[in-house]
Amino acid sequence: MEFIPVDVSTQATSKSLLPLVIALTVCVVSIITILCISEFLVYTNVLVLTLILYVLLWLLLTTPLQFYLLTLSLCFLPALCVHQYILQTQE
């Protein structure tokens, strides 16, 4: 019976945290940018481009379950909150 060494390094942890860090950074930057923009068409374009960036990053860096959970928690819910805030302030 052979002993097979198992590499328990931080590579697996950092690789699994990378999509979360990228998503949080993009989310914060995009929300700050969107809140500073008062014109609705520019806001909508920024929101759509941000969502496309999320989708590309998460498809490349995550498993399907992580992709689904990150998309719900960090993409659509904050975008919906910002969208509602802007609609309320424009009335």
From Swiss-Prot:
Family to which this protein belongs: Belongs to the papillomaviridae E5 protein family.
Q: What is this protein called?
A: Probable protein E5
Q: Which domain of life is it from?
A: Viruses
Give the gene that encodes this protein. Answer: E5
What keywords would UniProt list here? Answer: Early protein
InterPro entries documented for this protein? Papilloma_E5_alpha (IPR004270)
